[in-house]
Amino acid sequence: MAASIGALKSSPSSHNCINERRNDSTRAISSRNLSFSSSHLAGDKLMPVSSLRSQGVRFNVRRSPLIVSPKAVSDSQNSQTCLDPDASRSVLGIILGGGAGTRLYPLTKKRAKPAVPLGANYRLIDIPVSNCLNSNISKIYVLTQFNSASLNRHLSRAYASNMGEYKNEGFVEVLAAQQSPENPDWFQGTADAVRQYLWLFEEHNVLEYLILAGDHLYRMDYEKFIQAHRETDADITVAALPMDEKRATAFGLMKIDEEGRIIEFAEKPQGEQLQAMKVDTTILGLDDKRAKEMPFIASMGIYVISKDVMLNLLRDKFPGANDFGSEVIPGATSLGMRVQAYLYDGYWEDIGTIEAFYNANLGITKKPVPDFSFYDRSAPIYTQPRYLPPSKMLDADVTDSVIGEGCVIKNCKIHHSVVGLRSCISEGAIIEDSLLMGADYYETDAERKLLAAKGSVPIGIGKNCLYKRAIIDKNARIGDNVKIINKDNVQEAARETDGYFIKSGIVTVIKDALIPSGIVI
């Protein structure tokens, strides 16, 4: 991991970058220069603040609004990052760990939502943290409230402060909800969670706060996002996803003017209200064909907020607001603040339900191109180094699947499935369209023999099992001849005492559950 973090490098600078000197109309910003790594951007750069101050430039007046260029507000794959490394490091990343994760239960029974395993080797929290590190944002807080022990352990092992070249100033730190004389309640929502730690966030010498969710699957260059925020002189910039009419009814939609400024919000609109939220998405960079297919934009719950604006909104303007999306952001618009939309036109999935989690994981097995790839060397996804041996497959038939590290797979068939760390799968098993999360530890041969002698079941998948459309959480002990096929096509069922739940027709075996031999689910 140390080598991986040390290999982080800045994206090449575009020839079209604006080597702009902030004039008298630029708001106050800090002159402290930060360092993260020895890598640097080639070509034109934004002028460091210290250089401007030495030339007598003042920073106490707001700049007049700018006309928005589509290139400045979209995450086009043709555009290139042109922020100076110091500029992106003047941003504090704040990742919201989410609520209790009731819709993801039982996966959240013993862990916070961002700690849920993903893609055989990773956890959900690795996505926003890796996006930050790949964007040269090295100061990151993760706010949690429920079951944060495993999340804290993972982050401390994966992103230790003495690793890589960001050791001098970078960190990834968990902030759990706490009670104090000023705030006797737990987090009441996204905005309230940030408000309760404003005293800590404002100590950091940064220009903006980057607010992220801990349960989304996507790959995004935040440097472009931040650059768009600064070039448009926005108070708040909201990441927006283009939507067709079919999906739009499930999201909070936004309406923009010809400059890309947000002027209206609507939460899951229907009928005439939905039609009224149509926008010309060519303003944000889509071509004419895509704009006709995607005439709506939905908030991704990702924001860049200028530091002074955040302090003003949460402390003074809306001291009782609990949520960013439904209260603070619309409130800022009503106050006349400049709230800009930034188009992200790529794969994005909100991992909020069992079905979404299942589909997102199996999506990485899709041919010829997966929904989300962990193989992008220009923007890798980091995780905890475990130093496990390669997976061993003995007479196994494995197709269209992803296999994690340290697995032992014997004479079985696996198709269109994801198999997690340290999975042990015995002879004769057939696994289709399923997600196995693996195990936290190995049992020795002696321990497995002793369990078998006592009539108990070792960790892993027993002989001659059949799984279809199932999720098996970590450390599950499943005996021989077990069938998990949802034979009665049940859509919803809670069988916690029996070790499993069914949601959206997907059978989910609970972590540490014991399923005796011969059981049919």
Curated annotation (Swiss-Prot):
Protein's pathway: Glycan biosynthesis; starch biosynthesis
Molecular function GO terms recorded: ATP binding; glucose-1-phosphate adenylyltransferase activity
GO cellular component labels: chloroplast
Pfam families registered for this protein in UniProt: LbH_GLGC, NTP_transferase
GO biological process, one term: glycogen biosynthetic process
Nucleotidyltransferase keyword on record: yes
Subcellular location: Plastid, Chloroplast
Domain of life: Eukaryota
Residue ranges, annotated region (Disordered): 1-24
Keyword annotations: Allosteric enzyme, ATP-binding, Chloroplast, Nucleotide-binding, Nucleotidyltransferase, Plastid, Starch biosynthesis, Transferase, Transit peptide
E.C. code: 2.7.7.27
Purpose of the protein: This protein plays a role in synthesis of starch. It catalyzes the synthesis of the activated glycosyl donor, ADP-glucose from Glc-1-P and ATP.
NCBIfam families (alphabetical): glgC (TIGR02091), PRK02862.1 (NF002772)
Similarity annotation: Belongs to the bacterial/plant glucose-1-phosphate adenylyltransferase family.
Quaternary structure and interacting proteins, as annotated: Heterotetramer.
Name of protein: Glucose-1-phosphate adenylyltransferase small subunit, chloroplastic
Organism of provenance: Solanum lycopersicum
